């Protein structure tokens, strides 16, 4: 059945004609104008700044706390030919952050090395053993962290004790106690007053680069765009400026590694946007850090050797494929371990790759709609990630170590605490009366009419991009349309393309992961969709297509699966009239009881969200009918000629002569017997020639047969709506 994944909330409209006129000057249609107005943009100045952001809108990097100290120390290191280590992170934000600073320092003539920690051997953030190696073996005298550092107390204290200064540049959550670093550059530093708090790690690195070079180094913005999009920070203020310029730069990038990676990924650079980066580029970079040594990414992003770039890009793409396989394997295994009796899941196993557990937890959350904790067991510890529904803040649990935000967490705990963790979470949910089954909200920005939808509508909304956190891609509400066709597509027919029409207007809706619902989308009445707008380019033609976000059905869902071509859905229970279900929202009406009227009481007492009508009939009387007046007359006339007739041995001959099916003939003879037209003794039938004249309709057997035939005809040949109305007593 079609079940919505979200709780839909349609925004109310507004009627500010003045703002609509202002928006029109910027090339926006009224629908786009309404969306911006509801997102807090009301003046012409705000509107112009949003639609046409400028590099002049970037804030002064020296407003960041300790920026002056960081610049002074790095410049001194360059002047004194000190060895500088850039210490990054193993994700796309960390990779781009390190690459930005590497190119900046090399441009300034610095002696610089870059190291990205290995997730499995070094862990996240400053690692004392790594610091020790670079200090003792490589002669490093200045360490600059990017996208990490504010939690690296021990490693930074060690470096400072060894006479090596550490400049921290980071954007992660500040702790109460900060490390004793030479400088800490952070947009949320408690002693700072930076006007925008939501920079990614690469954004902070870029601000440092601008301060060092004393100019806005726009050539680095392609890397800033990748890291900012990948880290899913707020797409507002200067992040919006940097990403918009960076995406333009990416479309014409001269970076050999990015060119090769995009070529291998099949990315059309002309149509590249924030979704291309978020769903195709960033996952490939992240896959490297999730599974292996992330350091080759630095050469990919900054190198000039085309052949080496090609080889690294191939390797990264293969890691991404491997990542998908690992995720699928863990996901499949985790599903076999689910505890259906709990309002949450805590799943742990040896051998699971901790680098992908967040992805697995997210997939399980999407399917189960309840908090999920997925952990890998190694050396007596369980380490992994959690994903949670809106109703439950996972931080309320007790962890040895944790990180993340409300709804997502990373943690490490002793394996003997696993059951305690699960019980703690269960108790928290029960004690706080939390509804874990409640769906997350989906804001629908506007109801659209298919007949008013054009490519110009899409172009208007493209001006609002790049989309992301705090500037989400608009989601539109569609209803009152017809489904013209549905077809599966993709590997294993995993996806759908649904053609919807209204009047002369028609558009394709692409529904990823809905291939198993082809029948439902083709038959559902009252179908309503939540979609985003997208462009489809094929064979030189450009058209508007819709991308499905969610779907629901207004009213009960009735599906016709009669006939051999429609299998019974594996995940929907079959109705057993003798053991009726009480809690299911969907049911399959498979084999019908002989007395179909017995179903009416059941369906009038129970409400279902979806009913699948298979309607298999064990004894299909409807195929033969209930006997016509001529058939009864011909039967009587035939048997009247005989003194007696042995029905045990001559029934088939009689049926053949009368051209009546055996099963119907038996019923007709039973009707004659009931009306006393004949008697039957030991299988021998004799005509009662003194019987009173009576109507066939006086027979109870005839009435029951007629009713059965009519009911079976409805169940076999009627529409599902007619069947439903009859079962529910609506007619």
What are these regions (language model features)?
Residues 89-90, 117-120, 148-149, 171-174, ...:
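Short, ordered loop/turn segments at secondary-structure junctions
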Residues 2-4, 11-142, 162, 180, ...:
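Hydrophobic helix-and-loop "lid/oligomerization" segment in the mid-to-C-terminal part
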Residues 87, 141-148, 585-592:
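Acidic beta-strand-to-loop metal/phosphate-binding motif
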Residues 1-26, 30, 702, 708-711, ...:
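Extreme N-terminal flexible tails
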Residues 132-202, 206-211, 219, 236:
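Active-site cavity-forming subdomains of large catalytic enzyme subunits
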